[in-house]
């Protein structure tokens, strides 16, 4: 179960990074 949580956390961080990237247009 822990590995799944860590995977979700990683995906969430990537999603946030992508959102920031698009918002600031610093891709």
Swiss-Prot record:
An annotated GO cellular component: extracellular region
Gene Ontology BP, a term: defense response to Gram-negative bacterium
InterPro entries with a match to the protein in the record: Antimicrobial_frog_2 (IPR012521)
Protein's cellular compartments: Secreted
Primary location: secreted
Family: Belongs to the frog skin active peptide (FSAP) family. Brevinin subfamily.
The name this protein goes by in its record: Palustrin-1d
Lineage: Eukaryota, Metazoa, Chordata, Craniata, Vertebrata
């Amino acid at each position: 179960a822990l590995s799944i949580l860590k995977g979700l956390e990683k995906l969430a961080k990537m999603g946030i990074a992508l959102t920031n990237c698009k918002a600031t247009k610093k891709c």
